[in-house]
Amino acid sequence: MARVIVLSLFTLLWATGTLSAADQPNIVLIFIDDMGWKDVGCYDNDFVDTPRIDQLAKEGMKFTDFYAAGAVCSPTRCALQSGQNQARIGITDFISGHWRPFERVITPRPTMALPLDTVTVAEALKPAGYTTGYIGKWHLGNGPEFQPDRQGYDFSAVIGGPHLPGKYRVQGRSDLKPKTGQYRTDFEADLSIDFIRNNKQKPFFLMLSPFAVHIPLGAMSNKVEKYRKKAADLKQDLPHPVYAAMIEHCDEMVGRIVDAI
């Protein structure tokens, strides 16, 4: 099965490279961190409002059987970037900021960065004339030598820090700053829309990887209050109103990206 998939991918990339720029599709990959498959309306969640994601599912394709071989941050990101099983590269757990020998359970130490000789999806698309961009959370290497701009991305804005205004920043890019009081997901959407508009005359690949809905939980108060009231009416502890608000933030982000396209 793996060989068939790899062959299909190479065939697709070869076909893309033979098309004229006018016929090459623009590609936007939105990767929402730690969101459960049943946390959106198109998978029968009736608590959180996700109209724009639901619309994409209705008008496009929806997976009903899917398995993640490494359902945490770095392994999944490794698979998406490389097209390979995480174990082949050695990123089998999330890449921590430092070695953690104090943990009560010590897992095998994973590879601590995506190797630079790994061919990423961005590098595979470059020969076909694509301009490539990466925005949001990276988590495939902590040093500057392992960032997206070293892995085939023409534009990168790696953002570090929690969700709420004033708590995050673009690493190494003092020229990219959020508006005063801006929620992180909204800022990530702004950067993505700018990339789309700046590259609309040529084929582009954009990967948008917001930090939401990863912990620590945090959302704007108006949305949190909306779901707090909704949860109170249900008279149960779950779902979590802050988490629900974060999902709605992501849904709005998706809607803005679709509208920009």
Sequence positions of predicted segments:
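Bacterial N-terminal signal peptides
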Residues: 4-16
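Formylglycine-dependent sulfatase
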Residues: 3, 19-261
